[in-house]
Structure formats: structure tokens, C-alpha cells
């Protein structure tokens, strides 16, 4: 016991710093590494995004117990949630809020009877953000099979990545989002395990919102920093 007390006295400043950092990251803000391309082109593999854990709730440190509701997710928010279905922390975009009636056919969303509008900004996406074929992984998707479109999400414009030739997995019939749930999709519409696979997202699983990156490291290029993606608004 004396040894423990002595260790604490010797390192109390360091221990206090560690405790404060743990509390801060569990209740106020955190950094989330994005390992997949399900949110391309908005978020790419290797991005470290800032998670605002006070966006919707005040949470008890370490336990993720919600003490006070501050707000609810809005359509278009990029949310971070702990999915019990996939047993993983996921990052997706909210496209349906409670009360919405949503369907998707041929990668075109219809929300409350309004078919969303899409426009093409660039003829070809930036190849640095795309999966390209390689001898090590021949199943990766080639550049000319995907295109990026601007999606008007009922007033919020953002980019989505879709398969040029369509995909049956992008289709679902009308779904009414019940109270306490959200419908979330990846911006990379044909390569995302989202509400089409794991179902609607319970409000209680949502832990925060992201609006910008902190930094980005390129996993395909020896983790070289992508300076143009530092502090990038999403």
C-alpha cells in the first residue's frame, strides 16, 4: 500500500492528466479512425474524424450512460453509433428521421413523396480516394465503375458515390421511420453496410456527431499524411 501511495505522489500530475483525458474523450469529444470506404467521397480510409459527444446528449464518463438530452440528430448529420447488430462502431449519414417515409430505387432516394435531385459535378472522381485494382487484391473496384454525384438531401447538398451500372442492393421499398429510430446510409451507396443491412438505428446507440476531420493518413502510401484533409469540414 505504501508503494502505491508513493507511486501516486510521485506521478500524481501524470495520473491526473490521464484521468482528465479519459473523462474528456468519453463525455465531451473523441477521435475516431475510419478504416473503410463506406463514407467515400466525404470520408476516406485513414481519416481521423472529430466526434462531438455533446452534440445530442450529456453522457456519464466511461459508462456511456446518457444523463441529459440536448438535441436530436437531424437529416444529413454524420453520426457515430455503437451498433449492437454489427457489434461495431459505425459512421453513417442520417437520411431518415422519425416520421419520415423513405424508399430507394436505383440509388435514388424518395423522402416523404419527394424524389431527391442529383447532379454530376465532376466527370471522374479523384482516383486517390477510390479503390483501384491491384495484383494483391484483384476484387477491388476499378475507377470507371463509380461516379460521384451531388445529392440534394431536401436542402442539404453533399456528395455520394454510386455504381455506374446500378445495384439491386440499393433498392428498398417504402419504410416509415418510427419514433426513437433513424435511417442511416453510407455516402458510398453500393459499398456500405448501413440501415439496408443492419436495420434502423436506435436513438440510444448514437454517441455523437462529426463535422470535420482532425487529420488523415494514407494507408495505401505508407501512412503519409494527407495535408489537404487536415481539419477538413465534412
Which residues are covered by each model-predicted region?
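Soluble "head" domains of membrane/secretory-pathway proteins
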Residues: 2-7, 23, 27, 32-33, ...
Amino acid at each position: 500500500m505504501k508503494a502505491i501511495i508513493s507511486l501516486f505522489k510521485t506521478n500524481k500530475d501524470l495520473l491526473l492528466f490521464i484521468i482528465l483525458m479519459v473523462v474528456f474523450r468519453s463525455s465531451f469529444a473523441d477521435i475516431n479512425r475510419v478504416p473503410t470506404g463506406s463514407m467515400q467521397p466525404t470520408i476516406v480510409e485513414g481519416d481521423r474524424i472529430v466526434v462531438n459527444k455533446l452534440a445530442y446528449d450529456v453522457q456519464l464518463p466511461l459508462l456511456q450512460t446518457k444523463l441529459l438530452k440536448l438535441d436530436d440528430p437531424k437529416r444529413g448529420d454524420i453520426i457515430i453509433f455503437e451498433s449492437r447488430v454489427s457489434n461495431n462502431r459505425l459512421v453513417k449519414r442520417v437520411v431518415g428521421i422519425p416520421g419520415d417515409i423513405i424508399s430507394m430505387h436505383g440509388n435514388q432516394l424518395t423522402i416523404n413523396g419527394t424524389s431527391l435531385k442529383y447532379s454530376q459535378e465532376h466527370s471522374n472522381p479523384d482516383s486517390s480516394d477510390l479503390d483501384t485494382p491491384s495484383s494483391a487484391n484483384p476484387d477491388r473496384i476499378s475507377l470507371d465503375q463509380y461516379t460521384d454525384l451531388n445529392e440534394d438531401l431536401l436542402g442539404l447538398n453533399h456528395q455520394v458515390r454510386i455504381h455506374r451500372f446500378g445495384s439491386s442492393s440499393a433498392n428498398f421499398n417504402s419504410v416509415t421511420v418510427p419514433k426513437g429510430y433513424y435511417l442511416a446510409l453510407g455516402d458510398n451507396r453500393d459499398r456500405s453496410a448501413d440501415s439496408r443491412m443492419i436495420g434502423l438505428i436506435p436513438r440510444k446507440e448514437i454517441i455523437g456527431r462529426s463535422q470535420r476531420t482532425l487529420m488523415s493518413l494514407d494507408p495505401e502510401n505508407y501512412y503519409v499524411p494527407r495535408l489537404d484533409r487536415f481539419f477538413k469540414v465534412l
